[in-house]
Design a protein with these regions (language model features):
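C-terminal motif of bacterial Sec signal peptides marking the signal peptidase cleavage site
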Residues: 14-17
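Bacterial N-terminal signal peptides that target proteins for export
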Residues: 1-7
């Protein structure tokens, strides 16, 4: 019985591994970056909404990390949509490059403004709410136009 279970588990794991995105492909690279951005953003939002304790130094570091991450995924969107693999990006990403790039720049500006807000002392979570909301709004704007749900 154990052998059957082990064989079944091995087969399932092998099949699951076959369907993944190549982590070195442009799609794999941007998915990794977007997941990191989401995790950092959720932590920042959690601190401001009371879901997580507000830790000033962690917030400052995470805001800087988010700003850094925000500048990296765009290079992994090739000019022409790559073949193969499932992507949540709509075809509009490649058909409306100027608009996509404009939203990317808005996102970068919003994270830069959040970092700037972390330099004001004493650091108060209430003073960070509006800059963080702009970051979240810029994410949402791009998702609404260019992400297939």
């Amino acid at each position: 019985m154990k052998l059957k279970s082990l064989l079944l588990l091995t087969t399932v794991l092998m099949l699951a591994a076959c369907g993944g995105v190549d982590p070195n492909s442009p799609q794999g690279q941007r998915q990794t970056i977007f997941k990191q951005m989401l995790k950092v953003s959720e932590n920042l939002g959690g601190m401001l909404r009371g879901r997580l304790p507000f830790k000033e130094q962690v917030f400052v570091e995470d805001a800087a990390r988010l700003d850094q991450l925000t500048r990296t995924p765009w290079q992994h969107f090739p000019q022409v949509k790559e073949e193969g693999g499932e992507t949540r990006a709509k075809d509009d990403v490649w058909q409306r490059q100027a608009r996509f790039q404009a939203l990317a720049r808005e996102m970068e500006a919003s994270t830069a403004a959040l970092v700037a807000a972390t330099t004001v002392r004493p650091l108060q979570s209430a003073d960070l709410a509006a800059p963080m909301q702009r970051v979240e709004d810029s994410c949402k704007a791009c998702h609404e136009e260019f992400r297939a749900f």
